[in-house]
Amino acid sequence: MKVSEVIEGFVKGREGMSSSVSARWDVDGLALYSYNVCVAFWHGGAIHLTTEKYTATTSSHCNKVKEFARKENIRLDSFDPPHVRRRHIGR
């Protein structure tokens, strides 16, 4: 799959995988990973997007999430990675 297809699928609640991005279910629900770092997840009817800055590519992935979420009228919230989903991002 292309990166944009994985991200669009994530926003629509589907799993998918490309070389750098994956959307997969874990114990807390559907999450989006960029290079194995959780950058977004579904919770309470909203997509929670990381506030952490990683690489230009990961920022591009996050911007795509915002773009697709706005098209679908899905609420966006943010999360601070050191405090949320700690076991999923290796901290």
Regions inferred by a protein language model and the residue ranges of each:
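Terminal leader/tail segments of proteins
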Residues: 1-91
